[in-house]
Amino acid sequence: MDRDYISELPDSLLTQILLELRTKDSVKTSVLSKRWRNLWLNVPGLELFTLQFTYPDREEIFVRFMDRFMEFKCRSRLKKFMITYVDCKGYRDRLMELIGTLVDHGLQHLYVFMHTFDRVDFKRQNIYKSKTLVSLKLHNVELKNSDFVVSLPCLKILKLENICHGEDGPLVVEKLISGCSVLEDLELIRPFDIRTHKVLLLLRVSSQTLKSFTLHFAIYKDRTDFSVEIDAPRLKYMTVEQSQSDSIVVKNLSSLFSIDIGTKFNPLRHEDLRMRNVFYDFLTGISSVKHMIICLWSLQRFSPYSKPGLIPKFQNLYHLKAQMWSSSTHLLEAFLESCPNLKNLILEYNVELDREQVDFTNVPQCLISTLEYVEIKEPNEKSTIKLVNYFLENSAVLKKLTLRFSYSSSIYLKSYKKLLTSTKLSPTCQVIFGC
């Protein structure tokens, strides 16, 4: 008979193993044997989704489950509580009491995802004065009043998504940030509804400890402008997605290692001289970055930046991933001119059928001295061949050029190889065709 090694493990180790499972799967182990019957109750984490409870008695079963859990008196051992809550009308107030109780008993990780027609007011004072919370993630809750005290001395991770605020939305967010003295990771996804405000909103993100920051606003047609000011001297990783902001002002970002710019500055104001200056200042503020992902379409209507020399120098940038269109090669050329030490270049190429490709006119310094790896995704045989030949003919130290086709475009592979007629400037360069 095979030996049951798992049953020989101590309870402390088994509960850590069960912690890696979702709670609904952890509960299923209670039927294995008498020893396993209540073992799941000792797991220091609880992950719940109210829709997983059986319909039509979902609400009653959920309430009984939570009552049993609390009666077992394991609340003091719980370190992580995650709940995805879909309306259980009879339990909403009790849920808030439960969360408050768990926080008072030393909870470290709290994730609350509310899916209700009426948002839940999530302003319990003890939550924002917790001495043990390390991570806090809130989705679709209400924080309308900025008149509350925040003191979270251990909080390192904060995520706010789709939060409902009153007119003091930015102040609420700023208060949360300022009350986290060791905050390292901040993610703001639609942190307040920009459609409901009639005046310019200014969000200040100021932190001496922040290392990673993600900002994502939804795109709305009818909305007010907003501005973001970021002051974070230890920031290493930054992502700005689809914000269409009026301006993004950055200060003290000398530690910045990587940035992902998916944002489009206010598209109605690209011809505004002030906006051009704001955008130039933004690029200057991130010029120490080493790794960048950018959509060159973000620069498309800032026509002065299509000329070499008018983009700030990125002396430290060695890895660039850019999404570009066939008509924006002049922007790529200008951007490469500002990256004299670039080593790795990844291009996601998009074809504009009604636009002609603009030829390169210069050879940037990085092609002459530093560029070693180029990858072009989704190349099109007619519009991309000039670009490919340009890199092969002008990159003196290029080691590898990879053309990555999708499954649907792999039929062009053979004909594409025939079109590559240029002489490689770098004799050791490999041309790789892949999917």
Swiss-Prot record:
LRR repeats lie at residues 88-114, 138-162, 165-190, 191-217, 250-275, 324-349. CDD domains: F-box_AtFBL13-like. It holds the Pfam family F-box. Gene3D superfamilies: Ribonuclease Inhibitor. Keywords: Leucine-rich repeat, Repeat. SMART domains: FBD, FBOX. The keyword Repeat applies. InterPro entries: F-box-like_dom_sf (IPR036047), F-box_AtFBL13-like (IPR053781), F-box_dom (IPR001810), FBD (IPR006566), FBL13/AtMIF1-like (IPR050232), LRR_dom_sf (IPR032675), LRR_FXL15/At3g58940/PEG3-like (IPR055411). Residues 3-49 form the F-box domain. Residues 355-405 form the FBD domain. PROSITE patterns: FBOX. PANTHER family: F-BOX/RNI SUPERFAMILY PROTEIN-RELATED (PTHR31900), PROTEIN WITH RNI-LIKE_FBD-LIKE DOMAIN (PTHR31900:SF33). This is F-box/FBD/LRR-repeat protein At5g44980. It comes from Arabidopsis thaliana.
